[in-house]
Design a protein with these regions (language model features):
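Short, acidic/polar
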Residues: 43-55, 114-130, 178-182
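Beta/alpha (TIM)-barrel catalytic core signal, keyed to glycine-rich beta->alpha loops juxtaposed to Asp/Glu
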Residues: 2-15, 144-333
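Short acidic capping loops at alpha-helix termini that bridge into adjacent secondary structure
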Residues: 29-30, 64, 90-95, 133-137, ...
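Conserved beta-strand positions
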Residues: 33, 65, 99, 137-140, ...
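Active-site groove signature of glycoside hydrolases
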Residues: 127-147
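Alpha-helix N-cap and loop-to-helix initiation/capping positions
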Residues: 43-47, 75, 79, 110-118, ...
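N-terminal binding-site loop/beta-alpha segment at the start of enzyme catalytic domains
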Residues: 1-95
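N-terminal small/glycine-rich loop or linker at the start of catalytic domains
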Residues: 22-40, 98-111, 134, 139
Length: 334
């Protein structure tokens, strides 16, 4: 059976708000689609294709990948490459595609961290897997304490100059090293477009470390990953640990679901319901209420989850009372 030809929705750019990415000409959708865990070889390809098409039809034009996304490693890029060779090929110039290198990808000393050799080789492999001539953003996925920062940053500069990436980004860098990297890149006329880190209602580390303000001062966009704390900030765990959940299987650490955390989640859910939102929708809206956040990367295991997440942008306004109650519910973290 031949698949029907995909034609993107004519209304795709009226579905989401778009935000300026730092001091650049780039606008990103408020919600972007991350392909970390549900786009690899262990999931049906048709499910991944349906999610990508639905996302694009509803204004999500930014797709976020990394060399080792899957599972198995590389297979998220391979599956995305199948789309880029077929249904999404006519829309390449409408898509903003990122990938990364920095975590383990292949054996030996040159398949991990931040050396020039690893970053260059990894991006070449990623481009082949994704059927692309270039990516829009290439990230250094983490700071490498064993490699001079100048080596890692110069590799990013040269990647842009070679035309293999239009922009560069950093992910999961300590604030001090991010500041040094920002300066190095700016001095070579390859400014850092995006800084990516885990940031959500529960995990405020980037804000506490000053990374949101640092990014803004540098003219760098901030993009949040893991906005739902790997499913905690949904209705999934409000009654404990479901038998079919990632926490039950050991993929997530069950020790985080303490009595205090469970009480907080239930309280947050009550706030969300009063707002006419699900807990997940409110968690996404809470991030997007902050003008320092350019975009929020969502993951999804189904089109239905995507549909629910997209509703978050319908109500981004919080009263002072709501914000105070949210902070009170989460005081136990301090």
């Amino acid at each position: 059976m031949i698949d029907p030809v995909y034609t993107a929705s004519e209304n795709r750019y009226s579905q989401l708000p778009y935000r300026r990415c730092g001091r650049s000409g780039i606008l990103l959708p408020a919600l972007s689609l991350g392909l970390w865990h549900n786009f690899g070889s262990r999931k049906p390809f048709n499910d991944a294709k349906a999610m990508a098409h639905y996302a694009f039809d509803h204004g999500i034009c930014h797709f976020d990948l990394a060399n080792n996304y899957g599972p198995e490693y590389g297979t998220a890029e391979e599956n995305f490459g199948r789309l880029m060779a077929t249904s999404l090929r006519p829309y390449r110039d409408e898509l903003f595609i990122s990938t990364k290198a920095g975590w383990d990808m292949w054996p030996g000393p040159y398949g991990n961290w931040g050396s020039r050799k690893y970053l260059m080789a990894s991006l070449d492999q990623s481009l082949k897997r994704m059927n692309l001539d270039y990516v829009d953003v290439f990230y250094s996925h983490r700071w490498d304490p064993g490699t001079p920062l100048e080596e890692t940053m110069q590799a990013l500069v040269d990647i842009v100059r070679q035309g293999k990436a239009l922009y560069v980004g950093l992910s999961r860098y300590p604030a001090e090293k991010a500041a040094e990297a920002f300066h190095y890149l700016a001095d070579r006329d390859v400014p850092c477009l995006l800084y990516q880190d885990r940031f959500n209602l529960i995990d405020r580390q980037p804000e506490q470390a000053g990374l949101l303000d640092l990014s803004r001062q540098n003219g760098t966009g901030f993009i949040s990953v893991s906005p739902l704390q790997q499913g905690l900030l949904t209705n999934r765990y409000l009654q404990g640990i479901p038998a079919d959940s990632r926490m039950a299987s050991g993929a997530l650490n069950a020790s985080v679901l303490t009595d205090a955390m469970l009480a907080a989640l239930r309280g947050l859910d009550a706030v969300a319901r009063r707002r006419g939102q699900s807990l997940a929708e409110m968690a996404l809206a809470w991030l997007l209420r902050d003008e320092r956040v350019t975009s929020v990367i969502i993951g999804a295991s189904s089109v239905a989850q995507l549909q629910d997440n997209l509703k978050a942008t319908e109500n981004l306004a919080f009263s002072e009372e709501e914000l105070q109650e949210i902070e009170r519910l989460l005081e136990f973290r301090n």
